[in-house]
């Protein structure tokens, strides 16, 4: 069986649809074979991307080295439907097309968080720090959050856990609406900017996520940037709001962020990126769902596992530094089987 590769001109066409990582935050450490796997492309096609202007450096041994986030954006914007980021988004958003009740019903998950140590997928499980190896720390589930119940695993007494973990967790969603006009105003400001393409929804490097106002001013945002910005604006309006971060659960776990706001004593979730993606639909390779987009303003979903963070901080660290995006390849979840 052969794997169809993306057409070279299609990959090249993605280059003017996103903004590459600023030089001061870019990490040029992804080689051509890794890039080719992520893009389902031949090495020669990756070389053409470099020739066409995709930023890179040339290592005397490894050859051209790219920024992984730039590659993810090439994959997301090429429109082939075959690349790793396209397939991942399509799979993880598939539940938006499911019946409304399925978004909220209690759902039991078996979760494994064992971050990949390399872009090729070497897992952190069982690895100990020392002897020159990376020290891996991960954020644990927030068991105090509404709708989160630990069934097996733990204890998770500290916010950070050495190496990885496994757990069984029940997530229960909740359908909520929002009435406060201040919330609606801040929400519209963020979502409308994405919908009007004044700000491009794309992968953003972690150092730029930490400087979310700069990212927004540059005209780029992902879930972390949008959620932090939304939380800032809600707090400025006098509301209690926090940017949350955790995992969107599916065959593999995806790092995701959203905003939590308190209205009438009830914690309500605001997910501007989910709302945007569900609105544009086929443009991003997922089902268009106005009903799901509307539910993103207030409702809590049973596929989002919040972790213990103060303001959507990174979920995985290598040697005390935020891990690259490819570390998420070692995070997985599946529905728990009944005993």
Per-region residue spans from a language model:
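Short helix-start
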Residues: 56-79
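Short alpha-helical "recognition helix" segments of helix-turn-helix
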Residues: 34-37
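Conserved beta-strand edge residues that scaffold enzyme active sites
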Residues: 63, 247-248
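Residues that mark the N-terminal boundary/hinge immediately upstream of a DNA-recognition element
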Residues: 31-32, 67
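His-Asp-centered catalytic microenvironments across diverse enzyme cores
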Residues: 3-30, 41, 84, 88-139, ...
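Major-groove DNA-recognition helix of helix-turn-helix-type DNA-binding domains
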Residues: 41-61
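Cysteine-centered nucleophilic/redox motifs
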Residues: 216-244, 259
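Secondary-structure boundary elements
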Residues: 136-221, 229, 294-337
């Amino acid at each position: 069986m052969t794997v169809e590769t993306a057409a070279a001109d299609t990959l090249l066409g993605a280059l003017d649809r996103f903004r590459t990582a600023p030089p001061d935050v870019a990490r040029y450490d992804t080689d051509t074979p890794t890039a080719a796997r992520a893009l389902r492309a031949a090495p020669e096609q990756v070389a053409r991307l470099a020739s066409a202007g995709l930023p890179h450096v040339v290592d005397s041994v490894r050859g051209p080295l790219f920024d992984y986030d730039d590659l993810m954006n090439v994959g997301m914007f090429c429109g082939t439907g075959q690349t790793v980021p396209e397939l991942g988004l399509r799979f993880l958003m598939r539940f938006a097309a499911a019946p409304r009740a399925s978004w909220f019903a209690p759902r039991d998950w078996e979760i494994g968080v064992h971050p990949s140590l390399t872009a090729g997928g070497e897992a952190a499980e069982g690895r100990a720090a020392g002897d020159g190896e990376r020290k891996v720390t991960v954020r644990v589930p927030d068991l105090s959050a509404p709708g989160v119940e630990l069934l097996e695993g733990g204890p998770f007494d500290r916010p950070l856990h050495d190496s990885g973990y496994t757990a069984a967790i029940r997530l229960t969603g909740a359908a909520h609406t929002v009435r406060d006009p201040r919330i609606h105003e801040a929400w519209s400001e963020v979502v409308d900017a994405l919908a009007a393409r004044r700000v491009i929804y794309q992968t953003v490097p972690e150092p730029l996520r930490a400087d979310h106002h700069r990212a927004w001013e540059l005209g780029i945002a992902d879930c972390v940037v949008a959620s932090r910005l939304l939380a800032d604006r809600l707090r400025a309006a006098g509301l209690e709001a926090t940017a949350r971060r955790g995992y969107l659960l599916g065959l593999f776990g995806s790092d995701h962020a959203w905003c939590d706001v308190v209205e009438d004593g009830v914690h309500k979730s605001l997910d501007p990126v989910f709302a945007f993606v569900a609105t544009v639909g086929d443009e991003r390779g997922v089902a268009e769902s106005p009903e799901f987009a509307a539910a993103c303003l207030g409702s809590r979903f049973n596929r989002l596992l919040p972790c213990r963070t103060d303001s959507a901080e990174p979920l995985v660290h290598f040697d005390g530094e935020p891990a690259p995006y490819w570390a998420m390849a070692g995070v997985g979840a599946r529905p728990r089987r009944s005993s």
